[in-house]
């Protein structure tokens, strides 16, 4: 089993006989606008795995980011509100005013 993060998209899949688990993102998810984490329980080869989703106050996070002068705030705000990666905003016609 391989567990990893940094992709911001929670999922479980099998690849070449191995279980791959991406835990998603607590602060900047890009698959849903809810935060996610993984619970893994078990011993040896017997285990259970659960992706857990929790509510995330996106507007509060955006307010904090604005208060500390976060660079590229507009792109970050769109990303948090839509769960769409900032590199896709232009081609989708997204702006913070929508």
Name these PLM-found stretches:
Residues 1-6, 20-24:
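Active-site neighborhood of phospho(di)ester-bond hydrolases with catalytic His/Asp-centered motifs
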Residues 14-98:
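Acidic, His/Gly-rich catalytic cores of divalent-metal-dependent hydrolytic chemistry
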Residues 9:
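Short active-site segment of divalent metal-dependent hydrolases/proteases
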């Amino acid at each position: 089993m391989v567990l990893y993060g940094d992709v911001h998209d929670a999922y479980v899949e099998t690849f070449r006989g191995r279980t791959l688990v991406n835990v998603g993102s607590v602060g900047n998810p890009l698959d849903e606008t809810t935060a996610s984490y993984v619970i893994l329980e078990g011993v040896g080869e017997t285990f259970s795995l659960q992706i857990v989703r929790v509510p995330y106050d996106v507007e509060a996070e955006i307010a904090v980011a604005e208060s500390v002068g976060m660079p590229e705030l507009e792109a970050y705000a769109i990303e948090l509100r839509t769960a769409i990666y900032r590199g896709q905003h232009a081609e989708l016609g997204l702006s913070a005013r929508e």
